[in-house]
Amino acid sequence: VVGADNCNFN
């Protein structure tokens, strides 16, 4: 994800 610093994958 470009430009995002809070990507959560569960």
From Swiss-Prot:
It comes from the Eukaryota. Keywords: Blood coagulation cascade activating toxin, Disulfide bond, Glycoprotein, Hemostasis impairing toxin, Hydrolase, Protease, Secreted, Serine protease, Toxin. Is not inhibited by aprotinin. Glycosylated. Monomer. Thrombin-like enzyme that induces quick formation of fibrin clots. Only degrades the Aalpha-chain of fibrinogen (FGA). This is Thrombin-like enzyme D-V.
